[in-house]
Amino acid sequence: ASRLCIELGISIPVGKDSLSMRARWQGDDGQRVEVGSPVSLIVTAHAPVSDVRRALTPEISPEMQTSLILVDLVAGKQRLGGSALAQITGRDGDPVPDLDDPQLLVKLWQAVREAQAEGLLLAYHDRSDGGLFATACEMAFAGHCGVSLQLDMLTIDPFTADAGDYKIRTEQVTELRQTRVLRALFNEEPGVVLQTTRANRDRLLGLLRAHGLSVHSHVIGTPNDQDTIEVHNDGKCLFSLPRTTLQQAWAETSHRIASLRDDPACTAEAFALEGAAQDEPPHLSVRLSATSIQAWRDMPSAPAVVGQRPRVAILREQGVEVLYLEKLVAE
């Protein structure tokens, strides 16, 4: 963390070690009970934003004439150690992902800022938990549209000299082709997926090239109008399921956790409503009674702040350490 902060030019203003926290109490049966905190590091980043209207989100645009570009910050490494795939398959001992060259992250940040200033980007999402497959799915869920992934550039056999080179070598049989597909889909190495129009694609790739990221950048997909999540490789469709099916499965983990914490009947109703809403275009709606509407109309307008600023209180949840910045800005 210290090395990254120095190379990236950022600081950690405050922090606390919650990874070693434990709760101890005596149970009803008289036995001593101890629960340790989950060994999961959570880091909250904050920075001033001059114009929130230019913020990028993972919400993919359903426009068909667009492309998805993966910027891979580890030069093709696909380490699976500690990944979701490794956990569910019981695969231990693999090297874990790492940011081997922090300067690539700096270059990516500079390139993204320039691209956004030129209006080249429609959506942005990082590759993290679940790998590229989860990243693409989450973008599709946010935009309520399908996505087709093309993995040819991510599964190139390093031992094949050309497309017609079928000589059998010992090193060629050390890893099955489907293993390369799984590595490409589920490695959790640092990287991002950008969406741009096809008209702007060459300009964006040129900008990435100018920042030394061309070898790390690959066109890997596009939205589709079938509302499906598809994976293609070597001219074959390896996977295809309706987006709504995958989105419901993706939301089920949160639903089960909420069922343990909240009223099960209420969470079941909310989960069912969420599933029904997945077929609708993304929108916000509110239902107000006639009484509520009239009360809103009768509400006096807030006075303009022309003199001394009013006192403002910010309610802070326990354990939240960064909201003091908002207080400083407000003063």
PLM features: what roles do these ranges have?
Residues 1-17:
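A glycine-rich helix N-cap at a beta->alpha junction
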Residues 11, 17-188, 197-311, 318-319, ...:
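Intein/HINT protein-splicing elements and their conserved insertion hotspots or analogous self-processing inserts
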Residues 331:
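Conserved PLP-enzyme active-site core in the AAT-like
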Residues 194:
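Catalytic core of tubulin tyrosine ligase-like
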